[in-house]
Every structure is written in structure tokens, then in C-alpha cells.
Amino acid sequence: RHFSGVDEVAIMMKPDDFSCPFDCYYCPTQKDMPKSYVREEPAVRRAAQNKFDCAKQIWTRISSYAATGQPADKGEIIILGGTFSSYKHDYAEEFMRDIYYACNVMYDEEKRNRLSLNEEAEINKTALFKVIGNTIETRPDKITVEEIKRFNYYKVTRVQLGIQHTDDSILKKINRQCYTADTIRGMRLLKNA
């Protein structure tokens, strides 16, 4: 995507208890890190450096692209941090709003106050750095009709499903608590949305 002029901007949601309430045996759980991520990963390091502030993460990443002479005018935002659907709704909405806000004021010397998610998304249509997509990650068993409506409201354009395996006996051994039938149902709901 980068060679076609689209910057991929990976950002992390904050590492609170609600980043994922499940206890899959293989999932890393480092202190002060979102569940399933380790501090050595580049996106995690950037997020921690910016205290998991959404806007600061975006500004840091886009600035690094611009500093190397790469175009910095449009990007796909990849939202990491565990199970998006497990975050509190008000925090998720604020985080999604701040994506657009950060991109809208990226090149402004003085940063204005934040507006609503819908207002920021509308302004972004003519901003110097346009958001062309938002990718979130979640578990297949968290997909519901209501959750898809929430994704639409948040301007989510792509959903990465954490499909860890398709053999239910293995899923049970690793304490996944999300089985093949859940995956099929979640994929079907997303496909038909």
C-alpha cells in the first residue's frame, strides 16, 4: 500500500484491563501493555513513547514518513491494542474521533479544540492528510449486529478477526473460548453487513 501512496499508520489503544477480558494461554500479558502485545514491537514502542495518546501516535508516525521524503497525505489507520470490542464505548468513540482530529490538524501550527467524531470525519474530506480507512481487530465471537452498527458509526472500513485456529479441540486446549461456529457466524454477519 505504501508504494501506491498510502501510508499505513499503526496506533495502539491504551493498555487497560478491558483491552481483552479473555485468558487465552498463549497471549502475552506484559505489565502496562495492551493484551496480546509486547513492548519490543515498533508500534508498541511508539505508543508507549506517546503515552498511548492517539493524536500523538499519529503525528509521530506521519512525521517519520515525511522526514524520509515519503508522501504524507493519506493513510490507512490500523488500530491495535487487543479486542477493540472490549473497550468501553466512550473511550472507543473518543479514540476514533482523535484519529480524524490528529489527521485534520497535523500540519497546523496551532491545534484547535476537538469536535465530534462526525464533524472531524467531515472535515477530513478536505484535510491535508486524509484517512482512507480504519482497521480494527476483534474476536469473531464479539461480532453482533449491534457491534457492526457501532463499527459503521466509528467509520471502521476493515475488521481483522482473530481466528487463531479452526480445530475446536485445539481452541479448547488453549482456552480460546471462541470456536469455529463463532468464527463462521461472525464472518457471515460481517459479510452480510
Predicted regions and their residues:
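Cys/His-coordinated zinc-binding microdomains
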Residues: 28
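Conserved non-cysteine loop/helix-boundary elements of the Radical SAM core domain that shape
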Residues: 39-57, 77, 81-193
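N-terminal [4Fe-4S]-dependent radical SAM core
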Residues: 1-23, 31-59, 63-65, 70-71, ...
